[in-house]
Amino acid sequence: MQYFEDIPIGQKQAFGSYQVTREEVLAFATKFDPQSFHLDDEAAAKTHFGRVSASGWHTCAMTMAMLVENMKGRKQAGLGSPGVDELRWLKPVFPGDTLRCETEVFEKRRSASRPEMGIFKSRAKVFNQHDEPVLSTTSIGLVAVRDQNAEITG
């Protein structure tokens, strides 16, 4: 199990391989972001996207799927997240793309009010199969500490 104490500042990881399918793009857009450029080839061709593209929120969901799969593989003692500080959609994601993720932890601290919990911040970048960045985010993670009675330092 990976606890707060096991996560060093500067830790970098590269992981994931998410195949974006047309069916999934259309299903997500139909339910959550039914704009024509996510659903209709003809309408999308007339936009700056040029063709049907995934919703940015769908790209976030695909990113989350890769992050959680990586966390499960490392058996991280994750306790959720209070949110995201920054989110940027850098390039459209299209059916047929293959996504991967890179992360780096840049800050961490023990919670003063919840001694059983550590807080860390990380940057994530998602790339397509051409190594073009399509999404970047700065997020906050909560993770269990190994010994909540230990002195609260970093």
PLM segments and residue spans:
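Generic structural detector for well-ordered beta-strands
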Residues: 14-19, 88, 140-142
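HotDog/MaoC-like acyl-thioester-processing domains
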Residues: 2-9, 92-154
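Hot-dog-fold acyl-thioester-processing enzymes
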Residues: 1-83, 148-154
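Mid-chain, well-packed structural core segment of small domains
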Residues: 73-97, 101
